[in-house]
């Protein structure tokens, strides 16, 4: 179910704002940008009539409900008034009041790409201690650190995740090279290769690494090897030239089968020419995405050539389409003189650089 805060809720929050650790100065650290507390939402977006709340059951055999959207560190008495001011929750009882946690972190720039500390052999860091926020972020670091800790214990070569083949690689690279200035969240915009980092091609991207590291049992290893072999065969079939007439249309041109797959009216016909299975579906998706990946490579090459493209001192970063508030803030604070300097701002994303490059190049044309 979904409900919303209202004017009564906001009045309750404002009346207790001075007792919130976040606003009274008891907590000085910056909270997660993408998970603001309800008092922060009301403070920053005072003109909003309400904020959405998802009422999430805690399980099938419990009456407990988690109100997702009103995380808070307000005193318990204020929280009770807040919850009971919300439509549908007038008689709700709070079992566990909300709270805020301020935690320390270790500078992740002191870690190797394996997440081992540069100065203390055998000591690995993963999760919030590295300044990240989020379950998936912590789990991914735990996987990377665990693999490498095991490798050290067994005197084996460690695992290094590449940013071109995994979001784990993007995150570890960002953390260990750039460090953080606020809690780090993994976003697709942080990857310059995000069009390639699809859910359906995870086996092809990371399967070879898993085989190399020996972390799969015999059955898993066989399934990965079979998948890679089947995809290779499918890719070869999609590279073969086929005329439109062979696919049931009047076009006599001969093109690779994969190119015909980009036509929506022929996609089912192309799929029917390949054996059914996830490896073959993945190969077809690769063929469909190929022009976009080629364009992406061209954009990255152009941005590399235009590193010296000047940014005027009075440049309005707010006028760049597609820039998030976070990216605008980072650019305004840093005040880069050119695109190269902008690319070296900690936390700046490839997506932001692409948007900035496009705007600057168009203005210079």
Language-model regions, residue ranges each:
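Internal hydrophobic alpha-helix adjacent to the cofactor/substrate pocket in enzyme cavities
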Residues: 138-161
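Glycine-rich phosphate/pyrophosphate-binding beta-alpha loops
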Residues: 128-136, 192-194
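A glycine-rich dinucleotide-binding beta-alpha-beta segment and adjacent secondary-structure elements
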Residues: 66-130, 160-173, 278-330
């Amino acid at each position: 179910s979904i409900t919303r805060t209202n004017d009564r809720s906001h009045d309750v929050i404002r009346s207790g704002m001075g007792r919130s650790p976040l606003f009274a100065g008891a907590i000085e650290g910056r909270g997660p940008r993408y998970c603001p507390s309800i008092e922060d939402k009301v403070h920053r977006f005072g003109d909003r009539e309400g904020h959405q709340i998802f009422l999430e059951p805690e399980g099938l055999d419990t009456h407990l409900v988690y109100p997702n959207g009103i995380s808070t560190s307000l005193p318990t008495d204020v929280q009770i008034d807040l919850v009971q001011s919300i439509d549908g929750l007038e008689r709700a009882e709070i079992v566990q009041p909300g709270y805020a946690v301020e935690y320390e972190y270790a500078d992740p720039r002191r870690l190797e790409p394996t997440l081992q500390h540069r100065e203390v052999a055998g000591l690995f860091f993963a999760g919030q201690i590295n300044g990240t926020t989020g379950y998936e972020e912590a789990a991914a670091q735990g996987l990377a650190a665990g693999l490498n800790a095991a490798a050290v214990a067994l005197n084996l070569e460690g695992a290094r995740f590449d940013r071109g083949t995994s979001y784990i690689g993007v995150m570890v690279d960002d953390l260990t090279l750039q460090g953080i200035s606020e809690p780090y969240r993994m976003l697709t915009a942080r990857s310059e290769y995000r069009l390639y980092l699809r859910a359906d091609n995870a086996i092809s991207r990371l399967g070879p690494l898993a085989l190399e590291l020996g972390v799969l049992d015999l059955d898993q290893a066989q399934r990965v090897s079979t998948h890679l072999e089947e995809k290779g065969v499918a890719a070869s079939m999609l590279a073969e030239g086929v005329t439109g007439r062979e696919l049931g249309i009047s076009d006599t041109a001969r093109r690779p089968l994969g190119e015909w797959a980009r036509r929506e009216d022929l996609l089912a016909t192309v799929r029917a020419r390949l054996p059914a299975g996830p490896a073959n579906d993945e190969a077809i998706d690769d063929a469909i995405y190929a022009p976009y990946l080629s364009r992406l490579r061209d954009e990255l090459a152009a941005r590399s050539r235009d590193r010296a493209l000047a940014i005027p001192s009075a440049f309005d970063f707010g006028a760049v389409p597609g820039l998030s508030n976070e990216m605008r803030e980072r650019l305004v604070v840093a005040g880069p003189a050119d695109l190269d300097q902008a690319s070296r701002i900690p936390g700046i994303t490839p997506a932001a650089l692409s948007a900035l490059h496009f705007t600057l190049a168009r203005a210079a044309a």
